[in-house]
Amino acid sequence: MAAGKEIRGKIKSVENTKKITKAMEMVAASKMRKAQDRMRAARPYSEKIRNIAANLGQANPEYVHPFMKSNDAKTAGFIVVTTDKGLCGGMNTNVLRAVTAKLRELQSQGVSTQAVAIGNKGLGFLNRIGAQVVSHATGLGDTPHLDKLIGPVKVLLDAYAEGKINGVYLAYTKFINTMKQESVVEQLLPLSSEKMQAEKTEHGWDYIYEPDAQSVIDDLLVRYVESLIYQAVAENMASEQSARMVAMKAATDNAGNVIGELKLVYNKTRQAAITKELSEIVAGAAAV
């Protein structure tokens, strides 16, 4: 029964693994709900800022903020949002594949790139492919804080405002639902005029700006872009927990299937050993 003992050891090992993956699935499910709440809570804030800034822009059509101006620089910036940890399926792989495709497209046009990495997985990938990483933010935990993001991303925002780069792209995993997440590489800067259109309402707002409208719109647009980055990080975290929950559930189910197969093999092995012993006993009795 040496084989049977070995199989029992494998069953015990897989059962222990199943307990771990089940616990991780439950933890991810709990974190996913909190991450979704944060993601949804951030949307009204950025939308309200966008609408106020758009109203300001319409009231002051002669002023164009640097974030809405195009330039001819031969360098583009990337903000790449990934996770700090693994065990979340192919989520990071998919977004990094999309980033790679965009990098190659720009390089074929003679445009160099600079990158800000948010998350360990993206930072490691960008370093491996030899990308120019100008700043990074890692170890954000389960709750992203804007003050930890502002410093790293400000490097690219300032570079764009100064005309050193011709655009900023934001790459992250967009949360669709628990079972579906989508890799996105979208242009963050320059802000499109379509995006900055104010909502049509039944009544207009007559704002009083202090110290002046230009100062207010300068500050608002920076806050708006920062809120878009925060929203992307929040969406990425919701996607991470959803992907991890699904991956751990699949691992738990697979472990259950393996345990079932091992038990079947064990029972067959045990049955064969018992049959052999009975045959030997019968043969011995017949010989007597």
Curated annotation (Swiss-Prot):
InterPro entries: ATP_synth_F1_ATPase_gsu, ATP_synth_F1_gsu, ATP_synth_F1_gsu_CS. It is found in: Cell inner membrane. F-type ATPases have 2 components, CF(1) - the catalytic core - and CF(0) - the membrane proton channel. CF(1) has five subunits: alpha(3), beta(3), gamma(1), delta(1), epsilon(1). CF(0) has three main subunits: a, b and c. It is a peripheral membrane protein. The keyword Transport applies. The lineage of its organism: Bacteria, Pseudomonadati, Pseudomonadota, Betaproteobacteria, Burkholderiales. Keywords: ATP synthesis, Cell inner membrane, Cell membrane, CF(1), Hydrogen ion transport, Ion transport, Membrane, Transport. GO terms for biological process: proton motive force-driven plasma membrane ATP synthesis. One of its GO terms (cellular component) is plasma membrane. Disulfide bonds: none annotated. CDD domains: F1-ATPase_gamma. This is ATP synthase gamma chain. Produces ATP from ADP in the presence of a proton gradient across the membrane. The gamma chain is believed to be important in regulating ATPase activity and the flow of protons through the CF(0) complex. The gene is atpG. It comes from the Bacteria. Belongs to the ATPase gamma chain family. GO terms for molecular function: ATP binding; proton-transporting ATP synthase activity, rotational mechanism.
